Regions:
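Intrinsically disordered, low-complexity non-transmembrane regions of multi-pass membrane transporters
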Residues: 1, 168-193
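Structural signal for alpha-helical transmembrane segments and their membrane-water exit/capping regions
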Residues: 7-26, 49-59, 164-166, 210-222, ...
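Membrane-core helix-loop-helix motifs of multi-pass transport proteins
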Residues: 104, 109-165, 277-301
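Alpha-helical membrane segments and immediately flanking helix-loop junctions
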Residues: 75-139, 232-249, 255-278
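Alpha-helical transmembrane segments in multi-pass membrane proteins
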Residues: 39, 44, 48, 52, ...
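Final/C-terminal transmembrane alpha-helix of multipass membrane proteins
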Residues: 11-18, 289-307
Length: 311
C-alpha cells in the first residue's frame, strides 16, 4: 500500500471511530448534510442536470457551438461545443461543467486533452448562489454579490486563457466535426435516470463532508489556524467557510477576496463532486486541483482590486 493510501485509510478509520464513540452527534451531522442536500441542493441542481441532458440529445450544443465557434477557438483553442459547456456551467453552477465534459467524452465528441482545457474555464458557481445566497442572504448587500460574481467569472476566463494556451501544443487536430449521439426513444425516462444517479452522488458527498467538518471542529483542528480558521473551513466547504468569515468580517476588500476565493476554488466537497465525473474523461485530480487553486487565487485578487474604492 502506498504511503498516501495508508494516510487515507488511517483518516477513514479515525472517522469511523468518531462515529462509533459518539453516534448521536455524528449521525446528526450526516442528517444535517442530507437535509441540506434535500432542501437546497436537490431542487436547484436536479432540474439543470435533467434539462442539460435533454438539450444535449436535442442537438442544442451544436447550435450554440456553431454560433460561438470563432471566438471560442481564438480564445481557448477548444472545439465549438465547449461554448455550450461554458454557458451551462455559468447558468447552472457546480458541477454541471464537469458532468457535461464527462458526457461528451463518453460520446466521443471530445478527447482527454480537450477535456482538460475545457474544464479550466467551465467550472463555475451559479448566479443564483452568488447573488442570492452570498449577496442577499449572507451579506445583505447585492452589490457585494455582483462584485463576487464578476470576479469569479473573470477568474474562470483568465484561468482558461492561461491553461488552454499552455496546453495548446498538445491539442489534437481533426477535420471531422463530431456529433452528439442522439438520445434513445425514451428520452425523458433516460434523462431522469441519469440525472437522479448523478445528483445522488453529489448528495452523498455533501452528507459525508458534513460529518467530516463536524469531526474536525470537535477535534479543534481549525483552531490550529488561529485567525485564518475560516479560510481552512472554506477549503473544505465553501458555504460554511463563508458563514465563518462573515461572523467576524475583516476589511471589505479582504472579505470579498476571501468569499470570491471560496467560490472560485469551490471547496474540497465540490472538488470531489467534479472529479467523480472528470475521471471518466481521464482528467487527473491533481491537474484539476491546480486549475481550481489558480482560479481561486486569481478570483480573490480581482475581487480585492475591484473593492479598493469601497469603504
Amino acid at each position: 500500500m502506498k504511503h498516501s493510501k495508508k494516510i487515507a485509510a488511517l483518516i477513514i478509520l479515525l472517522l469511523m471511530c468518531a462515529v462509533l464513540i459518539n453516534p448521536e452527534r455524528y449521525l446528526s451531522s450526516v442528517k444535517d448534510g442530507v437535509i441540506l442536500f434535500w432542501a437546497a441542493v436537490l431542487p436547484a441542481l436536479f432540474p439543470f442536470f435533467f434539462f442539460t441532458r435533454m438539450l444535449t440529445g436535442l442537438g442544442f450544443p451544436e447550435t450554440i457551438g456553431k454560433f460561438f465557434e470563432k471566438p471560442i477557438k481564438f480564445l481557448f483553442h477548444t472545439p465549438p461545443i465547449s461554448a455550450y459547456i461554458f454557458f451551462m456551467s455559468v447558468l447552472s453552477g457546480y458541477p454541471i461543467g464537469a458532468k457535461l465534459i464527462s458526457e461528451f467524452y463518453k460520446n466521443g465528441v471530445i478527447n482527454t486533452e480537450e477535456s482538460k482545457k475545457i474544464i479550466a474555464f467551465s467550472s463555475t458557481s451559479a448566479p443564483l448562489f452568488v447573488i442570492g445566497t452570498l449577496g442577499v442572504f449572507m451579506l445583505d448587500n447585492v452589490s457585494y454579490g455582483v462584485i463576487i460574481l464578476f470576479s469569479h467569472y473573470l477568474s474562470a476566463i483568465i484561468t482558461g486563457l492561461v491553461f488552454c494556451n499552455v496546453r495548446r501544443l498538445n491539442a489534437t487536430k481533426s477535420d471531422v466535426k463530431p456529433r452528439v449521439k442522439p438520445l434513445p426513444d425514451n428520452v425523458i425516462g433516460d434523462s431522469i435516470n441519469d440525472s437522479v444517479l448523478s445528483v445522488l452522488s453529489v448528495g452523498g458527498l455533501i452528507a459525508i463532508f458534513s460529518l467530516v467538518i463536524d469531526v474536525l471542529y470537535d477535534l479543534k483542528f481549525f483552531d490550529l489556524f488561529g485567525n485564518y480558521s475560516p479560510l481552512a473551513v472554506g477549503f473544505f466547504e465553501m458555504t460554511r467557510g463563508a458563514k465563518e468569515i462573515i461572523k467576524n468580517p475583516p476589511s471589505t476588500g479582504a472579505l470579498l477576496a476571501a468569499l470570491t476565493g471560496f467560490t472560485s476554488f469551490g471547496g474540497l466537497c465540490i472538488f470531489l463532486q467534479a472529479t467523480t465525473f472528470l475521471k471518466e474523461a481521464k482528467v487527473r485530480s491533481s491537474y484539476y486541483f491546480l486549475v481550481k487553486v489558480f482560479q481561486g487565487l486569481v478570483g480573490a485578487g480581482i475581487a480585492y482590486l475591484v473593492s479598493l474604492p469601497l469603504p
